[in-house]
C-alpha cells in the first residue's frame, strides 16, 4: 500500500512540474508583464499541491491540480469542491490583509477556476447532453451552511464565490 502512495505522490509532483516547465518555456518569449505572470505560475506549480499553499493563488492552483488528478484517476462524476468558502477563506483573508489580492482579483481567479472546471467533459449521448445542459459532470461548489446549533457560516468568501459564478 505505502509503495502505491509514494508512486501517486511522485506522479502528482511530475504532473505539476510539467506545468511549471511549460510556464517557464512560454515566459521566454512573452512580453515583460506576461513573463512575470508566467514565472509566478511556474513558481507556484513547482510548489503545490505537494507542499502547503501559503497564498490564495497557490491554494487555487493546488485545488485545481487535485481536481484534475481526481478526474484522471477516477473518470469521476460529481467531484464537488466541497465547502470551498470554508477551507479557502484563510488564504483569502490573509491575502486581503497583506494587500496581495483585492476582492476583484479573487473573483477573477475564481471565475477562471470555474471556467477551467467546465472544460472537463465526457462524450455522452445527445439526450444525456441536452438534459445536463452540455455539462454532465455535476462539479459543484458548496458555500454557506449552518452549524449544528443553527448558526450561519456565510463568510465574505461566500459572496465572492457567488459573484464569480455569476460571471461564468
Where are these regions (language model features)?
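N-terminal leader/propeptide and maturation segments of large enzyme subunits in energy/redox metabolism
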Residues: 1-35
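Conserved catalytic cores of very large enzyme subunits
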Residues: 1-4, 33-168
Amino acid at each position: 500500500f505505502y509503495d502505491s502512495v509514494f508512486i501517486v505522490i511522485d506522479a502528482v509532483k511530475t504532473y505539476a512540474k510539467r506545468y511549471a516547465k511549460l510556464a517557464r518555456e512560454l515566459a521566454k518569449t512573452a512580453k515583460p508583464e506576461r513573463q512575470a505572470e508566467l514565472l509566478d505560475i511556474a513558481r507556484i506549480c513547482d510548489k503545490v499541491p505537494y507542499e502547503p499553499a501559503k497564498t490564495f493563488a497557490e491554494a487555487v492552483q493546488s485545488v485545481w491540480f487535485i481536481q484534475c488528478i481526481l478526474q484522471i484517476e477516477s473518470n469521476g462524476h460529481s467531484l464537488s469542491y466541497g465547502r470551498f468558502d470554508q477551507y479557502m477563506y484563510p488564504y483569502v483573508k490573509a491575502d486581503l490583509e497583506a494587500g496581495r489580492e483585492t476582492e476583484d482579483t479573487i473573483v477573477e481567479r475564481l471565475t477562471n477556476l470555474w471556467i477551467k472546471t467546465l472544460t472537463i467533459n465526457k462524450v455522452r449521448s445527445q439526450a444525456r447532453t441536452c438534459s445536463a445542459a452540455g455539462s454532465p459532470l455535476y462539479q459543484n461548489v458548496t458555500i454557506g451552511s449552518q452549524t449544528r446549533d443553527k448558526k450561519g457560516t456565510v463568510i465574505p468568501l461566500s459572496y465572492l464565490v457567488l459573484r464569480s459564478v455569476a460571471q461564468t
